[in-house]
Amino acid sequence: MRTPTYFAKLQNLAATTLAAAVCLSSLEARGEDYELQATVQTPEIAFESDTDIGLWARFHFAIHTEDFDTTREFYRRLGFTQGITGFPVTNTHAMARALGMFDLCQYELEKGEVLLFPGAENTTGIDLLQWRVPFNPEPPYGKPNHLGMAYATLMTGDLMSDYALLKSQGVAFLSEPYGAPGNRFVFMRDPDGIYLKLEESPILRPAQKTEQTQVMGMPYIGINVSDVEASVAFYRRFGYANVRWINEQTLTAEESAAWGFDEPVTYRGADVALDRGDRHRLRLLQWIAPYDPEPAYPPPINHKGINRLALTVPDVERAVAILKAQDVPFLSEVAPCCSGTDTDTGGIVHAIDPDGVFLELVGDLTPRPVPPQPAHCPPLEIRYPAPAQ
């Protein structure tokens, strides 16, 4: 068995001041000799209080696809040209429980990759997964006002150039771009129907090469909420201390159409952001009209669409204890992640926000024996992707 080496670091987890890195180490061998484990490295954090969980960065958000190869190529065209592969396609019962698959002995993936965007100006990771067992193929949210994690925003230096390029490639848009230069946006859908909001930077950067997009980063994730004050209070517990309120506003017919509606849109909300680490931002919108009360995707976390937001903390068990004391609900207990062996030094767990959004905490964990499989389950079998030919 080869000596483990760090084969990749998740690049661009934050702005230029980010000192955190999420590292994945592996042994590049065949079959049972292949191991992979995830560890989260953050700087020594001076916790500001006994209730500070040390949230430092957005690790990634997860997209579950029905056709990995097609969706992977789509995001490659947007700039996600690098990635980390080699994750186990099966895992422990504890990992299945962490995803809400309580009655399943082991889940099974078809394919998976953490997509990376070299040169991005902030955290842009996407955990792209195609499930084999179990998989919920129901379509993702039909409109961008659905409760839950509804869309990701991509910042571009030249929206009109990107719009023309992507439209020529057959990408589906809700409308033509709306707004003035430096303040334009347009919604598009990926091959699975997931919404992406393309937003123009205030500092324009005219396209130098017409055959590639001018996407430069991911300014925020859009989360729709039923009560913005309650949601802001919830996210403050995680460390989103910087809050910029968005006053109630009714959009013009033209701007409402850019959101995909033929009636006036009214909403209020807040941008919440970390004041350290990668300083990433979430946009919480409370829709007043039109309002869709249908809940976010229920567990298990296997529905086609955007399913979870992964966040890094120094110590996952400490974070869970702090949040549970504040009545934050969790889907399951912490699971060692992700090799399926007793060498894992990281763990994951999913908190649940007031509207059902899954927030995956990823952090250091003291190595421990692999939790036993339930008595009715066959022996644990960790399988890995077939080596590339």
Feature map (PLM): residue ranges:
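Bacterial N-terminal signal peptides that target proteins for export
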Residues: 2-16
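A cross-kingdom feature marking solvent-exposed beta-strand/loop segments within repeated
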Residues: 48, 87-111, 132-151, 160, ...
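Core segments of cupin and vicinal oxygen chelate
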Residues: 64-123, 161, 168, 178-179, ...
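N-terminal beta-strand motif that seeds the catalytic metal site of vicinal oxygen chelate
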Residues: 32-72, 84, 148-154, 200-232, ...
